[in-house]
Structure formats: structure tokens, C-alpha cells
Amino acid sequence: MTVVVSGVGVVLPRARSAPELLAPAAEAPPVEPKDLVGRKGLRYKDRATQLAYCAADAALRNAGLLDGGGLRVPGGTVAMVASSNYGNLDTICRAMDTIAEHTAAAGSAMDLPNASSNVIASSVAIRFGLRGPNLMLCNGATSGLDAVHWAATLIRGGRAARALVLGVEPDNESVRAFTGGSRTIDGAAALVVESEESAAERGASAQAVLGDYVRGAGLGRCLERLARTTGDRPALWQLPEQRAAAVPDTLLEGVDRHDLGEVFGLGSGALGVLQCAAAVGWFARGGAGPVYATAGTDADDASAGIALRGRAAA
């Protein structure tokens, strides 16, 4: 079964579309969710969830699945897969500080739902009426690409006709304290992925085709496995984040490299989704694939990769 990307949503301070991930604005203010999706439903939601609402809304509309009347397909046909490593860290830290300084009884009842790791995936599903399988990944360096993989797996396994895949990381004091002061993207990206047949049935355009996914120890071995599955060298390589270890110059020599982290900040759990969105933007700007999206260096517990192709090259 061929799985395609039929919708993309990008909500970053310096980029609001897939092509802008390749050519971002020089400066921009932080994302203000109420300006994008209105105030309704934002109260008591943490920043990660608010950003996720914005990216989900953009992706579903871009895919033709959402309009002013709501979801245009049965909610049970849409799975929700989200990825974030730091999403509700500020809520957890605030709750722990309250317990340490006072007692558990002093905690906020409004904060309690946000303490669940699944709050992003569940909140987005409830807001948009997505009643298919619901997954939340907090899986370190490879989390975003893992989310894309599991969304494709749900589709290939017949559990859903399509899936919304979302990656988000907020920027706040708790996250910066945890990451040693590193600036995160303070934004989100979302993809709608579905079977080629499903997209064709509703007249949706395929913006990219998802190829094979690989995961294991070592970035070099990950790239070798991707090369075997594609049978070709990539035209563009989306680099993993290099906080823990640099990517050797000897890997994929001569291939153009694109480092989203260098441009936008620490992507962490959102990186893989951002990379796939950037690949779609590259195809839209006339690029010819394949594009390798990779996450995790040799210093991480694993490396992962996905190859994407433009629809015309599939």
C-alpha cells in the first residue's frame, strides 16, 4: 500500500507553510494561537496543546478534511498520532513545586488533565472529532519520525483510512532548564497521511509519498539501510539534531544538507514531523527526490530515517 502526505500545517514564528521551512523569515514574533484558531477552547490548555491546535487546524484544512462546518469525513476514519518530548514539562514542574512548597491539595484542578503525557493527542482528537486510534509518543531523538512511521503502520494495517501526525515543542523556562538553556522551536508541524486510494477517492492531491522507515543503532547504518530500500542516493538530506554529537562529513558526501535545528532551534520530538513537512516544501519549490529525513546521532539511543519522494517521482 502506498501512503501519501495529503496535507501539511506549519506553525513556527518564522514559518507558516512547508516551503517557508526552506526559506524562513528573518525575524518574527512568537506564535499567538488565539490569532490563528480563536480564543474558544484555549483556556487552561498548556502552550504545547495550543500550538498543536493551530498546526492540526492548518493541516486538516490543507488536506481538505476540515471546513467551516467541521470535519468532512467520519471521525472514526482519522487516527491521531502526536510526538513531543517536552510538551507538558512546565505543567509537571509547576505541580511538583506546588507539592514541595505546600501539599498535593494545593494543586490546581485545571492543571491536572495537562499533567498526562497524552494530553496533546487526546485534546486535539477531542477538539476536531478524530475518533480513530490515538497515540502519543515521547520517544527521544527519533520520536517525530517514529510518529510518522506509526501513523503509516495504522493505515497499512487497516486501523484507519488516514491519520493526523503532529509534532510540537514549546519554549519556556522549564524546558530551557531541562535542556541546558537551548532554545526550542516554540511551534508545531502536522501532516495528514493516508492511503493513495483514500486520497484519490476524495479528490485530494498527494504532496509527497512516504517511503520505507528504518530504525536502529548508528546513523551510518541507518543511512545504508535507507539507501538499500530506495536504490538511489538522496537529493536532499534532512540532518538529525547535533547537540550530542556532530554528523560526520564523510556521510553522504556531495549530498545537499538541510539542518532545521540550526535555523529554528531544538525540534526534539517535533523534528521528524518538521523534516517531512520541509520535504513537502522542497518538492513544492521544484525539488526532485528522494529526500532523507533522519533523527538521532551515534550519541543517541537510536537513529531513524524515512525516505520521501515527490508525487511525480513516485
Regions found by a protein language model. Give the residues of each.
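Membrane-interface segments at transmembrane-helix boundaries
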Residues: L137-C138
